[in-house]
Amino acid sequence: MSFFDSYRKKMQMPSKEEVLPGRVQPIPTAAAHFVSGHPLKGPWPDGMKQVLFGMGCFWGAERLFWQVPGVYVTAVGYAGGITPNPTYEETCTGLTGHAEVVLVVYDPKVVTLNELLALFWEEHDPTQGMRQGNDIGTTYRSVIYTFNAVDRAVAEKSRDAYSQALASRGLGPVTTQIADAPDFYYAEDYHQQYLAKNPDGYCGLRGTGVSCPIPLAH
């Protein structure tokens, strides 16, 4: 396979015939957040809400959100594909269909979804399709997965507002997928809160420099 063919393959979602089979049992992961000590899989306090963000390599994306006041816990994992309970190595092949994502569990009385969305839009480049900077492939695509119709509408409205802001600077179009939350598979313990354990580790987050104009209250 030529370099061009290999690159093109990385940028395409796998067919059902190509996807890896995965497994029935979940991949072992950490029980508690390395920074906060809160349970990664719950139970969480009443009133907490959830959203999944994919914005390239999940190491830097997770650190971005666990630092936000009002975010109760974060976890990295895989979502949006077909393979059940994939490993990191399997996901990196591009043959699971999954994106690297961050689960953000937050208190809406302290931080709004719009505030989280503003960080999402500003801290990565949502116009790059199946890549994020030097991280190339469907695994690194930009996604927002919401857990109810109201939150999905809020996310779509924020996308429209940010699209206009980008267009005014000659940038775009936005390629971010917004959809109802699919199954979320927790990544291995090694990847959870990676940049807290490895402060000098890789972080590929790079924004466009365009501010998000959406109202922060919702």
Swiss-Prot record:
GO annotation terms (biological process): cellular response to oxidative stress; protein modification process
Entry keyword set: Oxidoreductase
Alphabetized InterPro entries for the sequence: Met_Sox_Rdtase_MsrA_dom, Met_Sox_Rdtase_MsrA_sf, MsrA_MetSO_reductase
Catalytic residues (positions): 57
Enzyme Commission number(s) from the entry: 1.8.4.11
Catalytic activities: L-methionyl-[protein] + [thioredoxin]-disulfide + H2O = L-methionyl-(S)-S-oxide-[protein] + [thioredoxin]-dithiol; [thioredoxin]-disulfide + L-methionine + H2O = L-methionine (S)-S-oxide + [thioredoxin]-dithiol
GO function term, MF aspect, one: L-methionine-(S)-S-oxide reductase activity
UniProt enzyme class: oxidoreductase
Any single GO CC term annotated in Swiss-Prot or TrEMBL for this entry: cytoplasm
Similarity section: Belongs to the MsrA Met sulfoxide reductase family.
Primary role: Has an important function as a repair enzyme for proteins that have been inactivated by oxidation. Catalyzes the reversible oxidation-reduction of methionine sulfoxide in proteins to methionine.
PANTHER family with a match to the protein in the record: MITOCHONDRIAL PEPTIDE METHIONINE SULFOXIDE REDUCTASE
HAMAP family: MsrA
Protein known as: Peptide methionine sulfoxide reductase MsrA
Species this chain originates from: Brucella canis (strain ATCC 23365 / NCTC 10854 / RM-666)
